[in-house]
Amino acid sequence: MQEQYNPQKIESKIQRYWEENKVFKVTEDESKEKYYCLSMFPYPSGRLHMGHVRNYTIGDVVSRFQRLKGKNVMQPMGWDAFGLPAENAAIKNKTAPAKWTYENIDYMRTQLKQLGFGYDWDREIATCHPEYYKWEQWFFTKLYEKGLVYKKMSTVNWDPVDQTVLANEQVIDGRGWRSGAVVEQKEIPQWFIKITDYAQELLDDLDKLEDWPEQVKTMQRNWIGRSEGCDIEFKRTDNNETFSVYTTRPDTFMGVTYVAVAAGHPIAKEAAKNSDSVALFVEECKNNKVSEADMATMEKKGIATGFFATHPLTGEQVPIWIANFVLMHYGSGAVMAVPAHDQRDFEFATAYGLDIKQVIAPVTGSDLEVNLNKEAFTDKGVLVNSGEFDGLDFDAAFNAIADKLEALGVGERKVNFRLRDWGVSRQRYWGSPIPMLSDEDGNELAATDDMLPVRLPEDVVMNGVTSPIKADPNWAKTTMNGAPAFHETDTFDTFMESSWYYARYCSPRHDEGMLDPAAANYWLPVNQYIGGIEHAILHLLYSRFFHKLLRDFGLVDSDEPFDRLLCQGMVLAETFYRKDEKGADIWISPSDVNTETDDKGRVTKAWHKVDGNPVFSSGMSKMSKSKNNGIDPQHVIAQYGADTVRLFMMFTAPPEQTLEWSDAGVEGAHRFLKRVWKYAVDVKTVGFQPLNKTALNNEQKVLRRDLHKAIAKVSDDVERRQTFNTAIAAIMELSNKLLKAPLNSKQDVAIANEALEAMLIMLAPITPHLSHQLWQELGKEGDIVNASWPEVDQSALVEDEKLIIIQVNGKLRAKLTVAADATKEQVEALAFEQASVTKYTDGVTVRKVIYVPGKLLNVVAN
């Protein structure tokens, strides 16, 4: 056995052993409880970063722990391989996206193996493989047949440089998040899936997800955005044409003083034909900031159309305005404006001199005040200036006004959702072709099963402008039912692939269907899912939706895909910079910088390793290419080993919080593993002795009690609380006690044997290479990965004696060791035998004695 811990000598050897013996290969086994642990699969960008390492280390720790608990554990890995970065890299490197992607996959797979992750590599998938996207295409055609897919013209955010549609969240300050180009509003035909048909179920079933972070569930609830209100019809005064608005506040309806429509609304388009100034404003709105955060903070602008509408209940004429804060793809593209009771409407009305009419007053006795010279009164209250509805509270007014609108045939109660149908068309090349066609007359046709997969050609040349399948007229040409037909040249949104990959892992080589139902129903739902909170809405919502679709097609028998969700925090690192001659920041890698720090680890001085000149610290920020502060996992593994990296990742912060990279912290983790190794050498040297619980002295009982307390804490911290950092702290505390304990008597050695075995198993999920090697060195049977998690010996936790704190008037005066079953009277008698106690009680009156059993006795005297 090596005297010193040397990870470079053992880790690659152990990884080969795991691979050659398929240690992590798993199949369905009805005799065992299953456990499916999944970390969000990576985009094959070329190299793993520390964010990946943290995510996958957490998943591996959970997986290995559950295996040690006796469960049949599946932990797969694959690649979210389609997407725009591959196209950009292909253009830059003059290669095909497929070639670039497959090379990256090969490299990153090697990196994952070097970190010792226990994946069943026989289940590996890549979403760019036709064998994968074939079934996605098949499912899309079935959704089309069921009426859950449709095509329509849609106003989209168009990036003129990347030539693709952007989600609202991908538009930053009116520009494309990747290209930086000014985003345009453009109408193009797009395919949609009717996620809105499942909106209520998606909302309701959030209540079933008891082991999801509340923050994620709240974000999804807000995104789905269920509201109860009224659809109300307004009639134009010039041509009697009607248009509808939706409101959640019908109680304010009598206070409508204008109506606002989106720039894309038919009324706005008509007005633009009549007025150059209106046309100019409508064009300006096309370049609006369109994310919701931007909409909330941007300046509210508008222009009058010159048209008016009739208020359905008062008969008053109200002007119709075009406003930049009304979006065509939300609701009907028109809103009723009540400036007295909506702050946005108030700001707009104030800016343009529009009427403000109060129709809600505070409830009698309320301390709320109304000051319409300053701001809108947005609270609920009682109606005023509302004719027959005066005096009604919110609920009564809601129903009374809704009843009247319905009776007059100009409105109806309606449940509305903010959620919109999922637009899955993308105008890029590197994605799954959408399995739809059109005939010469433009009629829609779904690809038949024998046409699938509709293959994406991989040997292509990227020109940086047009998708190769759009540029090649021959690619789209085919025949269907003996007649000419043309393939759709748009590709799927890559969220399509990531919305069902978790299910395909259950039967990745199944070629007779999308899923093998028996395998899917054995493994699903995923017991533990791990990934960043940035996926809280789109990916996690689409996956939940897809799972319900799979259920309704009889492919799975559960309602939700992921039982438990853990969202890990970001990895931060110190950032360093210099100024160039123009005053711009030049970011310098932390690996090129020497530093001095204060006692709290804060950088006080920094200089470049090469030239010795000073550099400046900009503090901690997320590891990124833009700030050049990423730490290459390969460098750290080469220096310290994978187990050190894993231990640092799990120990430095709770999993859901940000983790600050620290070279000193990495060194500390490495020192701990060296101490564990040394302890194992010492224990092996003294040999094995059987444990005799009846022969233990008091010190040995205390040490064994500490061991089993640690087992209990680590078990709970890892399984229930998922506070892996505190679990590791408990193991470290135990190891310190073990290292100080003597190895002289037989029972000293017996306890050391028991403790070392338990400690190696508890460390095995976190530092699997070290635990595997020491397990073998100690001559233990089998592989540690197949060992059983240590059980708590309850008898070891029973204390013969207790340490009791003695206080007088709340101040510590003595500490007494008493029998564990000592009564209050016995402890009190012993306390009053102590001179350090009687010094403060003699000559005064003892008012009462308070006893907290097994912990504290406080004498109150004066």
Curated annotation (Swiss-Prot):
E.C. code: 6.1.1.4
Catalytic activity field: tRNA(Leu) + L-leucine + ATP = L-leucyl-tRNA(Leu) + AMP + diphosphate
Alphabetized SUPFAM superfamilies for the sequence: Anticodon-binding domain of a subclass of class I aminoacyl-tRNA synthetases, Nucleotidylyl transferase, ValRS/IleRS/LeuRS editing domain
UniProt record, GO biological process: leucyl-tRNA aminoacylation
Placement of sequence motif 'HIGH' region: 42-52
Keywords, comma-separated and alphabetical: Aminoacyl-tRNA synthetase, ATP-binding, Cytoplasm, Ligase, Nucleotide-binding, Protein biosynthesis
PANTHER family assigned to the protein according to its UniProt record, in alphabetical order: LEUCINE--TRNA LIGASE, MITOCHONDRIAL, LEUCYL-TRNA SYNTHETASE
Primary enzyme class: ligase
Family: Belongs to the class-I aminoacyl-tRNA synthetase family.
PROSITE patterns: AA_TRNA_LIGASE_I
Localization terms from the record: Cytoplasm
GO CC annotation terms, alphabetical: cytosol
Gene Ontology molecular function: any one: leucine-tRNA ligase activity
Motif ('KMSKS' region) on chain: 622-626
Pfam families the UniProt entry points to: Anticodon_1, tRNA-synt_1, tRNA-synt_1_2, tRNA-synt_1g
Annotated binding of ATP, by residue: K625
Protein name (database record): Leucine--tRNA ligase
